[in-house]
Amino acid sequence: VAAIDWLGREVRCPGAASLLAMTAASACGYCEPMRQTTGFARLPDGERIAFAVVGSGPAVVLPAWWVSNMVEDWQFDPLRRFVEGLAAGRMVVRYDRLGTGLSDRERPPETFTPEFEDATLCAVLDELGLVRMTLMGISCGGCTAVSFAARRPERVDRLVLYGSYAQGHALGPPQARTGMVDLVRSHWGLGSRLLADMFGPNWSAEDRVAFTASQRAAADAEVAADLLALIYETDVRDDLPGIRAPALVVHREHDRAMRLSGAREVAALLPHADLVTLPGDAHLPWHGDGDAVLRAIAPFLGIEGPPAPANGADADALGELSAREREVLGLVAQGLSDPQIAERLVLSPHTVHRHVANILAKLRLPTRAAAAAAAARAGLL
């Protein structure tokens, strides 16, 4: 009850943004679609860790941020476009923690430690033969990146921390943290919905359903609860001052899963760090305006970021839409919901939801309202 009461104060009512639909097709706004390859690394005791690689060049490694599935997550167009943006001249590596996704699902309780997270990252790097790399720690993956950079400075070229924190105890009152872990363990369905509300307070109902389902498919209740407990117990404040690598800390101003105050603490403790704050409240970088996150980190990584549209969607971007997508966009601009559009066009709501997500991705727009405005400017009404 304490966790639910606290979370109720932390999140807003969900809005109409449609940012999470799953789709089999993807096209990057400023590069050709890329192919993801997958493989397995082995831990010292033989457990398999699934990893995925996109692109080529100097390595950018993303430590596991929450529960995940390398293949299923790749079907989410916003995530795919974000990773493709990072992979412009770089090799991007992601992996599933033990107990999640395509990695072996059996995970003993004693492995839920920062040391085991570090060992998992090392196993993936060794399997790929990576000696030196850039680490990009997203959410709780930031703590793994910090720990690794502090203990193996010779292997880390640069450090990017997005949506990160230094001490898990600062993420909520003790009773709320304990209550949230207990809720996830005993009622993973409700717990996953509450976490979705925190990760994306302005997601549409369809987006929350999709993300909730992806969490439950990626890990069972015990693993999710133990990982959440690990997040709350992790403290890397002592590691931060000793990191020699240049660092960039990026955070959205109204992130409710990881507060901006946590990012400020991280940046203050790092000796060679810059802090960049961005508008928005979505916790993961590929939700909301993912291109803005890429533009913020591109100069630091030495890659070409996505272009900044002068006035939102332009004529060229509208030209990327299929005939069906232009038809759906016109109905969105008229204020119709996904179920209403589905009924009008004799499509399933899921298909409409996928079309809307593709429209937002192609137009590089964050919300249905912005897409409606673009449709009006283009004369689609």
Feature-to-residue mapping (PLM):
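Conserved HGGG/HGGXW glycine-rich cap/lid loop of the alpha/beta-hydrolase fold
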Residues: F40-D104
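Conserved acidic catalytic loop of the alpha/beta-hydrolase fold
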Residues: E115-M133
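Flexible "cap/lid" loop of the alpha/beta hydrolase fold
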Residues: V146, A150, V156-S186
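Conserved alpha/beta-hydrolase catalytic His-Asp/Glu region
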Residues: L171, G189-T234, D238-D239
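Short beta-strand/loop motif that positions the catalytic acidic residue
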Residues: I243, V249-H251
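Conserved alpha/beta-hydrolase "acid-adjacent" motif
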Residues: R256-G262
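Catalytic active-site module of serine/aspartate enzymes centered on a nucleophile-bearing elbow/loop
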Residues: A273-G312
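Helix-turn-helix DNA-binding segment
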Residues: P309-A357, A361-L363, A370-A373, R377-L380
